């Protein structure tokens, strides 16, 4: 749940679809 290069909104708060 490290939304960096993933399409999930996590603790990072970065949603990269």
Curated annotation (Swiss-Prot):
Tissue: Expressed in skin glands.
GO cellular component: extracellular region
Principal subcellular localisation of the protein: secreted
Keyword entries, A-Z: Secreted
Domain of life the protein comes from: Eukaryota
Subcellular location per the Swiss-Prot or TrEMBL entry: Secreted
Function according to Swiss-Prot or TrEMBL: May act as an antimicrobial peptide.
Family stated for the protein in its record: Belongs to the Frog skin active peptide (FSAP) family. Septenin subfamily.
Protein's recorded name: Septenin 1j
Species of the source: Osteopilus septentrionalis
């Amino acid at each position: 749940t490290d939304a960096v290069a993933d399409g999930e909104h996590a603790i990072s708060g970065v949603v990269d679809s």
